[in-house]
Amino acid sequence: MHITIVYPGKRPVPPPLYGGGQRVMYWLGKALVQLGHQVTLIAHPASHIPGVELRPIAEAEPADESWHRLIPPTTDVLHLRKTPRTPPPKPFVVTVGGNGRPGQTFHPNTIFLSRHHAGNHGSVHFVHNGLDLAEYECAAARGDYAVFLAKASWDVKNVSGAVQVCRRAGVELHVIGSRNWPLNLHRWLPNIRGVRYHGMLGGQPKADLLARARCLIFPVRWHEPFGNAITEGLASGCYVAATPYGSLPEIVTPDVGVLSAKAVELAEVVKNPARFKPETCRNHVLQGGFTHLDMARKYLAYYEKVLATGRLGEANDPVPQTKPGFDANRLLPWED
């Protein structure tokens, strides 16, 4: 099959530092090539995926006609990351990575990131993100620190909750997150006792920090669509202390972490690592279906469905729509 991935934007595929969506599409392209398929990428000119033809497009938000002209005529199916304004000349699927606005509708060929994410938008179609395990290390000897890996400037990611948990546990917290902190947090956070702020990290520096961490703290207060940080931490041998929101119950099982919306309960988890084994956490990514090859195989099943019928579901299926009253930015409960 010839798959053309369309992902124009300000960041290349893969991104040098931050950019979960771009990194996932990088892993998907690699996996599709490994599985014997032909792949073309329409994306930022600095993009590169081994074995994939790049058709560069400099515009971050091009008109549909701009990228339509770049589609190879031999393409069987297009994989988009944004719903097109005008239908492209080939069968397509769209992966949506965020939460929709109340009442927002989506194209029938939309694929979400988890069962919970799909359900919040009136759909049953989803594929969990997968990563390339070879990019992550899992050290046998672990450091005495926890890691928070998220866009720390975003309230729903709850970095303050991570600080509370680690203070209760008496464990140092390393924060990997946004460099665009509000209120000059990037200046005063490193001065908080027991917290080290690394700003934006990627590649080997991030892998090194995760590979020796005790655990990953992920106390989000929203309906998390997926949470790449969770599988990155698990691949590195980190067990997970997180809230039970969004996709997290689909990813975190009792042998690799604990889910709770109470800081005191997560602090006990962070304080007592003996029940969790790094190799079990890493194997969970492989056995749980969270590798890039698992992801590619699931997407291939959807590609074949669209090629055969033109759509993911049945002709009379309702159009995916954000549930009435669903507010992605409303903070979910958290008990200090």
Where do the model's predicted regions map?
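N-terminal strand-loop element at the rim of the active site
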Residues: 10-15, 27-62, 182
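Nucleotide-sugar-dependent
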Residues: 14, 153-157, 221-227, 249-250
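A charged, aromatic-enriched C-terminal amphipathic alpha-helix characteristic of glycosyltransferases
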Residues: 61-62, 272-329
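Conserved donor-binding/catalytic core segment of Leloir-type glycosyltransferases
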Residues: 124-129, 134-176, 288
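Nucleotide-activated donor-binding/catalytic signature segment of Leloir-type glycosyltransferases, i.e.
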Residues: 185-201
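Short alpha-helical segment that forms part of, or immediately flanks, the ligand-binding pocket
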Residues: 207, 230-235, 249-250
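Short hydrophobic beta-strand element within catalytic cores of glycosyltransferases
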Residues: 238-242
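Conserved acidic donor-binding segment of nucleotide-sugar-dependent glycosyltransferases
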Residues: 253-264, 270-275
